[in-house]
Amino acid sequence: MAQDQNVPLVATSPPRKRRRPPKSCDPCRRRKVRCDRKFPCGQCERARTALQCNYAPIVTASSPSGGDISHLAAPSVREGDSPPSEPADPQRPSRPSAHSSHLLPPEQHQSQNKIIQNLQRRIRRLEDQLPYPATSRTTTGPDSDVSQAQALRHLHDRVLLTEEQWSDFSQPNNLVNGWAIPAIQPRLRVTPDKTKVFGPSHWLHTAEKFQVLGKFDAKEVEPSLQGVDSRSEVAGILKDCRHLRQTMKAQESVRLNHPVPDILSTLPTQEVCDSLVDAYLRTFELIYRIVHIPTFWEDYRRFWTQPQSTSTHFLMQLVLILALGTIFYSDRSKRVNLRRLAHTWIYAAQWWLVGPSEKSTVNLEGLQVGCLLLLARQTNILPTTSWLSVGSVLRMAMVMGLHRAPDLFPALSEYQSEMRVRLWVTVLELTLLSSLDASMPLPFSLQDIDCMAPSNLDDEQFGPKTERLPRPQPSERLTESSIQILLHKSLPVRVEAVRLLNNQHRQELSYETALRLGTELRSACRDVAALFDTARNQSRHVTPSSKMAPFHLRFIDTYLRRYILFLHRPFMIQARKDPRFYLSRKVCLDSCVVIASYADHLRLPSDNLDDLSHLAIVGRGSFKGALSFDVIISLGLEIITQLEEEASTRPSGSSPPFVADHLDKMAKANRVPLIRSLEHIQEQLLQIIALGNPSLKRYNFLCAILSQIRAMESGQPIQPAIYATIKESLLKCYTLLKASHAASSPQESVESLTTGPDSLPDFDVDALDPALGLEIPSLLFFPGLMDMSGTEW
C-alpha cells in the first residue's frame, strides 16, 4: 500500500519548467539595457565598470569538469570598500567559463588577463591589510604562462580564504576602551582634469549605502551619461541640466586678462631652450624628482614640431624648467635677458596655477607645476613667502591623496602610483626646507602619512604604458632616484629636528635630543659621501649613475649640515658662558667650515663658475649655501668668542701691543683660515652687488664683523672702527648700485630700483658720524629699526 502511494507521486507529477538562462551580464540586466554578450561587454566598458561585468553560470546536470570554473564566485572588492564580512554566496553570479577564453579575439583575451592581474593586485592589498600574516600569502601566485582557468581558480581560493580571515577580523573586539571597528579606507577620484581623495569623514562613504544610488565606480563618483541609455528621456534631461549648469557657472566667473597672453612668443630659440632644459635636468631633477624624464623629452620634441597643439600644463612645466635653467646659463651676454624672461614665465605659471583655472589644476600635472614654481621662486631673486606658498602645494597634494599609500587605490596605474610617490617625497622635502628657512612649525605630521619610499628605478625602466613595474634595483646600484631615496632615509630625523627647533610652545631645548639628532644627521652626511664615492667607482660603466655630479654632493652636504648647525647653535651661544656646552661650539664650527669651503669655487667676476656657485648667487635661504647669513654670523661669533677668551686671560689694565705667548700664537694661526674664508665671502658678496643684485645686508654686516675682529686683535676701540667701516661699505654699495642701474634700461634690468633713474639721491657719508647717535643695527638695515622695505636682502 505504501509502495502504491509513493510511486504515483513521482510518476504523475508534471515536469517543472526550467527557467531560461539569462544571456546578458548582470549589470546590463539590472540597468535593463541591451548587452552585446562580450566579456567585458561594451555597456560595462563605456560605464567604466568592466571589472563588475559578470555572467550567470549555465548550470548543467553533470558536475563541472576540471577546467570549468563557472561555478566559482569571484566577488569584486571595490576601491575603498571594507572587505565583506559574510561568506561568499554560492548562488552569486560569476565570470564565464574559462574554457571559452581561447575562443575570444586577441584583444578580449588580453583584456581578461588585465582583469586577472588587477584582481590579483586588489586581493594582495586586502591580504596586506590583515592584522596578521595571511595564510594565502604562502601560496605562490600563478605564472604568466598558465591558463586563465588556473589563474581564476587560484584567485578563487585566495578570495575565499581572505574573506574568511576578514570575517573573523571584522567581528567587534571587546577592547579595554570599548568596541572597535575597521578603519574606513579613503576613496580616490581620478578624472582627466581633477584628482581628489575622499577621506574617512566624507559623506560619500555614507551616501553609497543608499541602494537608489547604486554602486559608485572606483574612478568616477559622480553620475555619468555612459551608464544611462542615451535614448531615454532621463539622459536628455540630464544633458540639458549639465549644459545649463556649465553655462551659468561660465557667466558668473570673472574674466580676467592673462598677464602673458602669448607666452610662446617669449621663448628663446630651440638651441637656447635645449641648453636650459639640460641644465635643469642635470641639477635639480635628480634631487627633487618632479617629471618623468623620457616622457618629458617626448613632449618636448613634440612641442617644437606642433607648438600650437601643446597642452597648457606642459607649457607651464616647460617655462618653469627654462626659468630654473637660466640660473646655470654661462653666456653673460644673454643671461640678463633670460633672467628677465624667467620672471615673466614664473608670473605666468603662477597665474595659471592659482588664477581662474585653479580648480582644473588639481591633478598630477598641476602639482608638478606647483613644485617647479616653488623652486623657481626660490632661485630667481623674486620676493616670496615660501612658507605660505609651500603650504598651498602641500594641501594640494593631500587633497589628491598623495600622502596615502598608492596600494589603497588599485584603479591607479603603476606609472601613476610611482609618480605620486616621487612627487609626494618632493613636496615633503620642499615643505621641510621652507619651515627650516622661515623658522616656522611644520604643517604636517608623519603620523598622517603612510606613503612608501620611491622605487630604486631609472626613468627608462617604466612609463605611462607600463602595466607592471620591474623589480627595483639593489640599493648599491645607482639610479636616477638614488639621491631622493637617500634623502628620504633621513627624512624622519630632519622632521624631528625642525619640530624641536621650531616648537612654539617649548619651555626648554633638550641637549640630549640635540646631540642624538646631530649624530644621526652626521651619519646621514657620511651616507651621502659613500653614495657619491660609489658613483665615482662605477663611473667607468655606462650607467645612469654618471649623471651624479659634484653639484649634488655639495648641495646635499650643505643642506644636511645646516640642520646640524641649527640644532647646536642655541647651545653654542649658551657655551659662551657655560663651558658644559663647548661641544656645540666645535660642532657648529666644523659645520660652518665645511659649508664655507664650497665658496672657494666662487670666483667672481670670472665667468668660469660651477653650478653650485651660480645657485649661491641668486638663491634664497638654504640655496645661498656658503653665502648664507647663518654661516657668516656663526663663523664670526666663534672668532669673536675666541678673542674674548684670550682677552679674559690678560692682566687687567694691560694695553696694546699685547704680548702673545706660544698658545696665543697657535690660536691666532688657527683663526687665520677662518678670517680668510670670511674675507673671501665678503669680496664675493660685493661682486654680486656689482652684478645688479641689491642684496646689502649680508655684505655690510660681514664688514662690521671683520672690523670688530681686527679691532679686538689690535686692541683698538671697537665702536669707532665699526662706524668707519660701515660708512665705507655703504658708499661702495651705493656706487655699485648706481652704476648698475644706469647701465641697464628698464626692459633689461634684472631688478629695478624703486626710484627712477634720475631720482637717486646723493649719498651723504658725513651723516654716519657716531656723534649723531645712530645705532649700528639701524645702519645695517635690520627690519623694524629702519624703513628699508624696498631693499632686497
UniProtKB/Swiss-Prot annotation:
Family annotation (CDD domains): fungal_TF_MHR, GAL4
Keywords: DNA-binding, Metal-binding, Nucleus, Transcription, Transcription regulation, Zinc
InterPro entries from the UniProt entry: Fungal_TF_Env_Response, Transcription_factor_dom_fun, Zn2-C6_fun-type_DNA-bd_sf, Zn2Cys6_DnaBD
GO molecular function: DNA-binding transcription activator activity, RNA polymerase II-specific; RNA polymerase II cis-regulatory region sequence-specific DNA binding; zinc ion binding
Gene3D superfamilies: Zn(2)-C6 fungal-type DNA-binding domain
Keyword match DNA-binding: yes
Keyword Iron (UniProt): no
SMART domains documented for this protein: Fungal_trans (SM00906), GAL4 (SM00066)
Domain of life of the source: Eukaryota
Gene Ontology biological process terms from the UniProt entry: DNA-templated transcription
Alphabetized Pfam families for the sequence: Fungal_trans, Zn_clus
Annotated GO CC locations: nucleus
DNA-binding region: 25-53
Compartments it resides in: Nucleus
Region annotation (Disordered) ranges: 1-29, 60-113, 457-476
Phenotype of the disrupted gene, per the record: Does not affect the production of oxopyrrolidines A and B.
Function: Transcription factor; part of the gene cluster that mediates the biosynthesis of oxopyrrolidines, polyketide-amino acid hybrid compounds with feature structures of tetramic acid.
Protein name: Transcription factor opdR
Source species: Penicillium oxalicum (strain 114-2 / CGMCC 5302)
